[in-house]
């Protein structure tokens, strides 16, 4: 993965809303060139990334190929998968896994495996292509990236800061093309809403699983970023596609507990 960017942005920080795998990855990429503020709605341990267990896919083995991965993805998606997106992910998957290794993620090793990693096979995959850290892959990835972000002088992480809405030209009543100037965020410990000006705002807020009664998602997965984007005038699509993990431990008085297929 490239560690350089050319966004042609005005001076100032980038605000990343979300401190999971997506948010921390983009923060680490951007921090080489400009200050980055990362907002975490709750405690950092509440990220859905840290809850993920099974592993991460990469076309790594000599018995694997881009075409095989794309074909498996399309079959698992019952033929309604966007092929361009599936192919892009498959083509960049090995580089993404290598970037995570370089970032310090402690995947389960196999001296004979590609990149020295142990690969496993899960449902829908024709070959072994799942790099994992035992059965706590999300936690291992999140811990490694969070450690790098915390030690980076250009990254500021604000825990328990909940993004309320984007600051747009509509809020400022400016007669111009739609533009985002920053974010309104609630400092949950102090009970104050702060306005953060930004050269750009990245929405990395995860999914919407917690709007349903039964889900394996953490309480933070309430679709905040999707709602903010929609209010700002962005096009929102494919909202009918919601991931439900097929196996959970159910208790009527407690959160559902994901049972990994790994």
Task: Describe each region flagged by the PLM.
Residues 76-118:
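Rossmann-like flavin
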Residues 1-71, 134-262:
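Residues forming the flavin
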Residues 86-88, 98-105, 127-132, 172-177, ...:
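Short, charged low-complexity intrinsically disordered segments located at boundaries
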Residues 2-4, 12, 69, 73, ...:
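N-terminal flexible segment immediately upstream of the FAD-binding catalytic core
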Residues 30, 54, 103-129, 133:
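Beta1-alpha1 glycine-rich phosphate/pyrophosphate-binding loop at the start
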Residues 79-83, 116-143, 209-213:
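Helix-loop-beta segment of a Rossmann-like dinucleotide-binding subdomain
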């Amino acid at each position: 993965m490239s560690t350089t960017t050319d966004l042609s942005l005005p001076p100032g920080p980038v605000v990343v809303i979300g401190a999971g795998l997506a948010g921390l990855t983009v923060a680490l990429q951007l921090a080489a060139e400009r200050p980055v503020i990362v907002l975490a709605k709750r405690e950092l341990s509440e990220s859905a990334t840290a809850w993920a267990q099974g592993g991460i896919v990469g076309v790594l083995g000599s018995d694997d190929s881009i075409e095989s991965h794309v074909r498996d993805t399309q079959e698992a998606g019952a033929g309604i998968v966007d092929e361009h997106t599936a192919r892009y992910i498959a083509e960049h998957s090995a580089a993404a896994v290598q970037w995570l290794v370089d970032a310090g993620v402690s995947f389960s090793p196999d001296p004979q495996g590609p990149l020295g990693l142990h690969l496993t096979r899960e449902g829908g995959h024709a070959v072994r292509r799942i790099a994992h850290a035992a059965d706590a892959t999300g936690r291992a990835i999140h811990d490694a990236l969070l450690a790098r972000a915390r030690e980076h002088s250009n990254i500021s992480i604000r825990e328990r800061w909940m993004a309320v809405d984007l600051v747009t030209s509509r809020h400022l009543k400016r007669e111009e093309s739609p533009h985002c100037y920053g974010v309104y965020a609630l400092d949950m410990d102090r009970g104050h809403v702060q306005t953060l000006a930004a050269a750009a705002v990245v929405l990395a807020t995860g999914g919407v699983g917690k709007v349903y009664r039964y889900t394996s998602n953490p309480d933070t997965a309430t679709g905040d970023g999707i709602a903010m984007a929609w209010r700002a005038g962005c096009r929102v699509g494919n909202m009918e596609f919601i991931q439900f993990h097929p196996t959970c431990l159910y208790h009527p008085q407690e959160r559902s507990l994901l049972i990994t297929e790994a």
